[in-house]
């Protein structure tokens, strides 16, 4: 296929949608495409220079006539400006709201054909989709796009059920950069964090929102720590962090739980971990599961949303019901005490990563969509 000029608009902050949008752009740039990020700030994963990657900042001014800064209008104007000046072939919007709507407005301003691809990541459907004042706008955003993808079949199904669009929604899974997420030498990393060689390490990585149920993770770890020597790594930050700290103090686990905040090299922490817990009550995919699996960490997740598409129960990990701390504890101890089971899960997970979630496969799927939409030279 010919090399394309692709505009990407996304949330630049820490979070699955921003990570995938940025990593996709980086991989596309490596394949020779010209990538233009159009965002409010530099995406946090855009940490290396590449001659094919360009950043265009959306600067929002405050005016007395507007009660709130007009980000959406400014973004639409910026997309149109960049698309016109750089002669973009494609605009890829990550999130239906506001990005797909802004891409549509930009297309109307351009008055020329430009392909709009919208990727649904979760919150734009599973949270905003339940707001009656936004549902029709989300449907409009989806149906105004030329192609629409969702990061899991579960999310696509929920979108059809809740929003009821007529547009076809294709499932294209998330992916990770296999060159980054791989198991590393662990002795020095463990020593750096004061973890003894014979201690088991449990890890949880999230944005510490209520839906992540971090308190369940702590309760499961409390049970684990009562049975074996272990440490819990809590990686990330968010509104539930203070509540998590209170629970840790209540259970007297201060010496066994490391609150590490946001980390740039989370792959180092996965490399020293024996078990990954993701016990969310709502999860459209669970990108952190792929990251952990690639680093050789067996995973336990809840049987909701897109997680069962990532973890095959009793094949590449365990699934438990939301809130079932007892079952999660039992499954965790099975993995921590049975090295053969742990190794079996790890091997199966890596095979599934290579077959279903490889960056080569996923990026090629997006490339095919772009090629279908791009005007011939």
UniProtKB/Swiss-Prot annotation:
Record key words, sorted: Glycosyltransferase, Nucleotide-binding, Transferase
Any GO BP annotation: bacillithiol biosynthetic process
Domain of life: Bacteria
Reported regulation of activity: Inhibited by BSH.
Gene Ontology MF term list: glycosyltransferase activity; nucleotide binding
InterPro entries according to UniProt: Glyco_trans_1, Glyco_trans_4-like_N, Glycosyltransferase_grp1, Thiol_BshA
Transmembrane segments: none
Chain sites annotated for binding UDP: 207, 263, 291
Entry's EC annotation: 2.4.1.-
Known catalytic reactions: (S)-malate + UDP-N-acetyl-alpha-D-glucosamine = (S)-malyl N-acetyl-alpha-D-glucosaminide + UDP + H(+)
Residues that hold (S)-malate according to the record: 17, 95, 123
Inactivation phenotype: Mutant does not produce bacillithiol.
Annotated S-S bridges: none
Family assignment from sequence similarity: Belongs to the glycosyltransferase group 1 family. Glycosyltransferase 4 subfamily.
Function, as annotated: Involved in bacillithiol (BSH) biosynthesis. Catalyzes the first step of the pathway, the formation of N-acetylglucosaminylmalate (GlcNAc-Mal) from UDP-N-acetylglucosamine (UDP-GlcNAc) and L-malate.
Known partners and oligomeric status: Homotetramer.
Protein's UniProt name: N-acetyl-alpha-D-glucosaminyl L-malate synthase
Organism: Bacillus subtilis (strain 168)
